[in-house]
A protein has these predicted regions:
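Accessory, non-ATPase domains that flank or precede helicase/AAA+ motor cores in DNA-metabolism machines
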Residues: 1-305, 743
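N-terminal pre-P-loop "Q-motif" helix
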Residues: 315-331
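Conserved helicase motor core of SF1/SF2 NTP-dependent helicases
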Residues: 328, 355, 359-361, 370-374, ...
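Conserved lysine of the Walker
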Residues: 345
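Conserved helicase motor core of P-loop NTPases
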Residues: 457-623, 742
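C-terminal accessory regions
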Residues: 627-743
Length: 743
């Protein structure tokens, strides 16, 4: 084991999540590259290191650091070097030289014990002397905290965030009530706080723990789409989480209401418990929708004439419902247009665009996902953006505090203070828009703007909380035009014809005489998987003229023989087998490999992406990768500990190893995750599953994801049963009620 002492000359690379750092160390023998994990280091610091020399095949000789210790510089040269390194704001090399010239080896004692004497140095006022002393003390305090916090399993990034919030109070917080961190520090949840509490000996029936556990249970229900829980359901779930009897925790719900963290509302179904955040979010969305829902003064005969003129100029043949949709869009501040595949939603959008362009209106088009926005652009010939990009999502960490627990909120560049400058906003795939995203969108819309929402009300609800489209329709307070006619060209597609049969609850004929809709009857899960592999590898690529990577397997479940997790492990071995040329990285019980098809499974507003030429020149860059984005792993860099993924439009994103839990293999995905996307072909393995999940909405959504070919493999009886099953997983929302209260 080598022992080396020297100065941190330059930090080449640092992974803030796990502390992995590459830096140049300057010592008596010259410069040396060092690699290892460090809680906290800065350029200019004096380190004592132990480690082993290694030879990297690309970067040459390095010191693989095992242990490190920060030393306070003792000689004049060392002190001057540290102070002038930039570690202390406002002190450069010149001023550092004057300080050390004045106080010599006694400099740090002077700073710590007699900071006012720094004013004896030319260029330092009494105020600046105090600032320098405070910074030196803060550096020392933070370094101690960055060593203390990781003992509780906290990452370096999270440790820094905790210290920035609490400062020197962090020790008291950890010892007395770590649960408060779940409320105040992004990235700390109940379970992290509970683990810390267990390590410091806080009892399981602590008031702090029970209150935090109840609130955590309520917030967790958001991931199921709920905006509230009935009190009896909340108490039962919380008691299971906390392992505490229901009667011992009931009184704490009222405590949370007194603290204004939750809102209690009586209803016919029982006492509703909302987090205050979502309760007021629903109220705000209802109020903003009410304010936008104005009528515009339009002469009917003039409007009809202008629509006919648009039809002739744009060579559009609208039916009565489509024409009605255009008229309603002109008459009202809010319009909802619904319809299944092949009913002319795109033609209707195009007619609206032509009409408003003729009027000289500014129009913005957007959709919830990148794929949906791309499809909207191709269908209209006008640029469409994701709603996030339209709202200019912020990657500033300070904006994390403005976002709610599922990652949405006010962390957008466009908002009430900086609204969108547009006369008309058209949103496609509206069924995917959840309550927080709707709130952010409405925040950025100026009074007098027309908002047109287009979607398929029979698809699955949004992944996030709420069911905005269905609640707006259910309120009966907004104009709704339902497109039902299937146009001639669409009638030639059995995908579209069968989708409408499914929607009407009619049996689908499975005789395989179709050109684009097939059912292969199999009963054994392993046989089904074998058929799926053959379809993707050999049959479908030629049939639909697409790469195997463009053919998507959709399955109802995550777990089980035909669930996402098992399918992905098997499909990975066939579609992207291991090779000496491909780097790999284990992430828990999963393996990521160069060439793998992957999906981002949560919103990350701070991840940077860039588009580069083949020569490495950056031609575009931005922030944010979002839930449902799909890409290919291009590179796994074991030296930097990063994984590079290329998404649509050649956007490349570098993931530090520490956040690889945000990526999943995507050879197979759940039907829910496929919302808003369209693929050349989909393959749907299907055997018996839970009735509440295996319903008409689910199979309808799956079938309508395919552009050229649908192939189901499995049980035809399960398929027909799903068509007849109209039960839905209940979502606790009250937006429709809030809207009606304002009408």
């Amino acid at each position: 084991m080598e022992e080396i002492k020297g100065y941190v000359e330059h930090i080449v690379y640092r992974n803030e999540d796990n502390g992995y750092t590459v830096f140049n160390l300057n010592n008596d023998d010259g410069d040396l590259t060092c690699v290892g994990k460090f809680h906290y280091i800065e350029e200019g610091e004096l380190l004592e290191l132990t480690g082993e020399y290694i030879v990297h095949k690309v970067y040459g000789t390095q010191l693989q650091v095992e242990t490190s210790k920060v030393c306070q510089p003792e000689d004049k040269v060392s002190i001057e070097r540290y102070l002038g390194s930039g570690a202390i704001k406002g002190v450069g090399p010149s001023l550092a030289g004057r300080i050390v010239k004045k106080f010599g080896g006694d400099t740090f004692r002077i700073i710590e014990e007699e900071p006012e004497r720094l004013a004896e140095v030319k260029g330092i006022s009494e105020r600046k002397a105090r600032e320098i002393a405070i910074q030196v003390e803060e550096k020392k305090d933070m370094r101690e905290a960055m060593i203390y916090l990781p003992k509780y399993g906290i990452s370096t990034t999270l440790a820094a965030r905790i210290y920035q919030h609490y400062g020197q109070s962090v020790y008291r917080v950890i010892e007395e009530n770590p649960y408060q961190m779940a409320d105040h520090v992004p990235g700390v949840g109940f379970k992290t706080a509970d683990e810390i509490a267990s390590k410091v000996g806080i009892h399981t029936d602590s008031d702090y723990r029970i209150r935090s556990g109840i609130f955590y249970t309520l917030i967790q229900s958001v991931s199921e789409g709920h905006v509230y829980l009935l009190q009896e359901v909340l108490l039962y779930r919380a008691s299971q989480l906390l392992d505490v009897e229901v009667q011992h925790i009931e009184k704490y719900v009222m405590d949370l209401a007194m603290e204004k963290k939750v809102v209690l509302k009586e209803s016919d179904e029982g006492l509703r418990v909302y987090s205050a955040h979502y309760y007021y979010m629903e109220l705000t969305v209802a109020k903003m929708l009410h304010d936008l829902n104005v009528d515009f003064d339009v002469t009917p005969s003039v409007l009809e004439h202008r629509i006919h003129m648009i039809e002739e100029q744009a060579e559009l043949a609208l039916d009565d419902r489509q024409r009605e949709a255009v008229m309603e869009a002109v008459r009202h501040g809010i319009l909802i247009v619904t319809g299944g595949p092949g009913t002319g939603k795109t033609t209707t959008i195009n007619a609206m665009i032509h009409f408003f362009e003729e009027e000289g209106a500014d129009i913005l088009l957007a959709a919830p996902t990148g794929r949906a926005a791309k499809r909207m652009t191709e269908a209209t010939g006008c640029e469409a953006q994701t709603i996030h990009r339209l709202l200019e999502v912020s990657g500033n960490p300070e904006d994390d505090d403005k976002r709610d627990k599922v990652g949405f909120g006010n962390g957008f560049g466009r908002n009430a203070e900086n609204p969108l400058e547009s006369d008309v906003i058209i949103i496609d795939e509206m069924s995917m828009v959840d309550l927080p995203l709707m709130k952010a969108l409405l925040d950025a819309i100026m009074p007098g703007t027309r908002l047109i929402m287009v979607g398929d009300g029979n698809q699955l609800p949004s992944v996030g909380p709420g069911r905005v489209l269905k609640d707006m329709i259910a309120s009966d307070c907004f104009p709704v035009v339902k497109l039902e006619k299937i146009f001639r060209q669409a009638k030639e597609s059995d995908i579209i014809v069968n989708a409408h049969k499914i929607n009407r609850g009619e049996p689908v004929i499975l005789d395989n005489k179709s050109m684009d809709f097939f059912f292969l009857k199999r009963s054994d899960p392993n046989v089904i998987i074998s058929v799926v592999i053959t379809l993707i590898q050999k049959k479908l690529p030629k049939f639909v003229d697409a790469s195997p990577y463009d053919i998507q397997v959709l399955t109802p479940m995550r777990k089980g023989n035909l669930g996402v997790e098992r399918l992905n492990k098997i499909l990975q071995q066939y579609l992207n087998p291991p090779s000496p040329q491909k780097q790999e990285k284990e992430v828990g019980d999963r393996l990521l490999r160069e060439g793998d098809k992957v999906m981002q499974i949560k919103n990350n507003y701070q991840l940077e992406w860039e588009v580069c030429t083949k020569y490495g020149m950056t031609i575009d860059k931005g922030l944010g990768v979002f839930n449902g984005d799909m890409g290919i792993i291009k590179n796994i860099n074991t030296y930097e500990e990063t994984v590079t993924v290329e998404y649509d439009e050649q956007r490349q994103v570098k993931y530090p190893y520490a956040i690889l839990d945000e990526l999943e293999l995507a050879y197979a995905i759940t039907i829910h995750k496929a919302q808003g996307s369209e693929y050349p072909a989909v393959v749907i393995p299907l055997l018996q599953g839970p009735r509440q999940l295996y319903n008409r909405n689910l199979i309808y959504t799956a079938v309508t994801r395919a552009r050229k070919c649908v192939t189901l493999v499995g049980s035809d009886s399960v398929f027909q049963e799903m068509i007849q099953n109209t039960s839905e997983q209940r979502r606790n929302t009250s937006l429709a009620e809030r809207i009606r209260e304002l009408a």
